[in-house]
Amino acid sequence: MTEAIIDLKDIAVTFDDGHQVVHAVQDVNLQIQTGDIYGIIGYSGAGKSTLVRVINLLQSPTTGQVVVNGQALQTLSPAALRQARKHVGMIFQHFNLMQSRTVMGNVIYPLLGQKISKQNRRAKALRLLKLVGLTDYAQTYPDKLSGGQKQRVAIARALVTDPQILISDEATSALDPKTTTAILELLQRVNRELGITIVLITHEMQVIKSICHHVAVMADGRIIERGPVAEVFTAPKAPLTVDFVETSTNVRAAIQRITKTIKLSELAAGQELIAFKFVGQSTKQGIVSQLSQTLGVDVNILFANIDQIDGQNVGDMIAIITGDLTAFNAAVTNMSAQGVHTRIINEEVVKGMVD
């Protein structure tokens, strides 16, 4: 295992204005490995943005220890902390560009005051503008740029100090889907070509699914679930995680549509409405034909979807399975052995687990 570049230990952040105490972050332990793209997801108010501001001590924790690049940040002198912060770049939803400066002026701004010649500053900025695809816009002012172009400038500016970590705080939230995809692909390229560790904050599971290797789910200031993205998508445990996953894969909408169309009380004896989750090699196997031909189970497919998540195929299917109880139990056992997860939807509806 590679070394943890970020190690947050027993972090809590409490705000007290004299009238109300807010526990923004509670009992968080988080390790992020060098070179990872780590997503932190949660709804507004979950504490995710507060947590990532702890990484470079823009927000001091009430309790806990912050270790970045092997340095315990709370023990550093102000000068040493300023130097450590140069290794952590940040991009935000609203870009924070200076309107009075050109694209070039915005990118080189963090280098002003450093012992770098004007020629070298410009050369470095041009290399980064080439990386983000804005070489021809060096002398353009921000008000002439699209939202996606502004975010590319912000990324170049964040990289100009040669950070080892890049924090993306809802950086795609204000962008349209096509531009979001382009920015996420750029972040992947930054991670791949420059080896920069990326911490990505979002409320959209689609963003996590697109580029992250690991994910932590936050609610009420706590991490309620974490793990490799493909694993979390395949077998989410916390109800909030299930909600995020099923929304991003359209499974929730499909279940709602199907259960409104089909009267579950009219399912015949020996029929079940089943949701299947496939991962990895199981997506390439003819499991449906196996069920039909080997076990004598009829499969009526009502919904199917397949995604690629962190290099693995992850598929969903909803179907009505028809067969006697023995055949059905044999089918479930057979699929579990091949890495296929199953859920009986009609039982969940009866128990009120599905809206």
Swiss-Prot record:
Domain ABC transporter span(s) in chain numbering: 6-245
Keyword rRNA processing: no
Enzyme Commission code(s) on record: 7.4.2.11
Main location class: membrane
Catalytic activity: L-methionine(out) + ATP + H2O = L-methionine(in) + ADP + phosphate + H(+); D-methionine(out) + ATP + H2O = D-methionine(in) + ADP + phosphate + H(+)
Assigned keywords, A-Z: Amino-acid transport, ATP-binding, Cell membrane, Membrane, Nucleotide-binding, Translocase, Transport
Cell location: Cell membrane
Record GO cellular component, one term: plasma membrane
Entry-linked InterPro entries: AAA+_ATPase (IPR003593), ABC_transporter-like_ATP-bd (IPR003439), ABC_transporter-like_CS (IPR017871), ACT-like_dom_sf (IPR045865), MetN_ABC (IPR041701), MetN_ABC_transporter-like (IPR050086), NIL_domain (IPR018449), P-loop_NTPase (IPR027417)
Domain of life the protein comes from: Bacteria
Membrane topology: Peripheral membrane protein
SMART domains: AAA, NIL
Disulfide bonds: none
Binding site for ATP: G42, Y43, S44, G45, A46, G47, K48, S49
A Pfam short name: NIL
Function, as annotated: Part of the ABC transporter complex MetNIQ involved in methionine import. Responsible for energy coupling to the transport system.
Family statement drawn from the similarity comment of this UniProt entry: Belongs to the ABC transporter superfamily. Methionine importer (TC 3.A.1.24) family.
Quaternary structure and interacting proteins, as annotated: The complex is composed of two ATP-binding proteins (MetN), two transmembrane proteins (MetI) and a solute-binding protein (MetQ).
Record-given protein name: Methionine import ATP-binding protein MetN 1
